[in-house]
């Protein structure tokens, strides 16, 4: 089911000069989206939202394209998962316009709702296909774990090794669903990721070492932001380098143990040990 709230944002945008009060009216009419969004994915401050209002005009044409194309892309990618993996699960997608925080995310549930923030997305159809395939990849992965007897009571969702592994699997599977694009698109969801990818390739050893150091010293929300959020990038000048590490780890598992082990590694092996051993190589 697709809950597309972008048209109600556009209606407000076109009918009035959007001020904070008007924007907040949109946010409060969709608590199913914005409670989660402002809790974990975007600061809910007047300054942040006033800046967003200034940034919307440059993005409004893209948002108009995305409100029409994204629901079609979601259906198309859902069908691709069905055709490739015989994957049929009822999923819920929320499309919205936010405050320039996260671009897309999934609730931390086995079959969590998926959220897509139009102002942070590229309107290019292939870019949309990849980010949708990535988010559905998280759900597919969870269902595979569930089918293999995963004990969710023991799942440490916020652990660094878990984050690294889960983002790696979602990226890995998105490459199988949307084939033939430039490698960097699977990480950046736009055409601007080439230098970012090259930086990772040239500095992988150093990046692995730094992640391992952060992990050993104790994981914090600041470190999660540094490695896995758009707001990171203090260490090396590039954010979300954890996605590259995760995909490299998953490709290593696929090579060493076979592809079927990729999706169930978390409940069959000691994930922390596996990740730490790989980071130390």
Spans of model-derived segments:
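Non-catalytic architectural context of zinc metalloproteases
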Residues: 1-67
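Post-HExxH zinc-binding segment in Zn-dependent metallohydrolases
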Residues: 2-16, 152-206, 210, 279-281
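Auxiliary, metal-adjacent structural segments of Zn-dependent hydrolase domains
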Residues: 53-110, 125-126
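Hydrophobic (often cysteine-bearing) scaffold residues that line and stabilize catalytic clefts
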Residues: 70, 129, 162, 166, ...
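A short mid-domain helix/strand-loop element embedded in enzyme catalytic domains
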Residues: 89, 95-115, 136-152
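Short pre-active-site segment immediately N-terminal to the catalytic Zn-binding motif
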Residues: 118-131
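Active-site recognition of the HExxH zinc-binding catalytic motif
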Residues: 130-143, 167-171
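Pan-zinc metallopeptidase signature
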Residues: 202-281
